[in-house]
Amino acid sequence: MKRRALMAAATAAFLMGVCGMLQAAPVAEVISYGQSGLKASDARIHEAIKQAAQMRKWGIVSDKPGKVLLVYPTNNRSLHYQATVSVTYGKGSYKVEYVKSRGLDEKRNGCYGKEGVVCVHRNVNRWIANLGKDLNRILSQSY
């Protein structure tokens, strides 16, 4: 009986460890709009960034010419976790880059055995990808 309980506890601990590892993923980069071949003015890209941020409920922390700093989420969940991204734009294109996070399992010194790779909770990549999709859709509607 003791052996069964010990085996069950060991299995549960192993599965919890594996599930925890599956939560982290390397940060992905969003392909910029300018690489699609279409061009938009900097003013139009800036407006699209603000629209997409509002649609996805990202908060604007800093808004300077050529660079907008966004955080997600902006509701009560932000007390527990938050991701920060930078959207740089100019010359008809933009780029969404991960900056930092809090409470999202960030590992800056490498993950999955790869040095220099930043890993965060897998949802961060989805949030960034959705923001990028909305930006591309908004900018594509301009033409």
PLM regions and their residue ranges:
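Extended, compositionally biased intrinsically disordered regions at domain boundaries
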Residues: A5, G20-A24
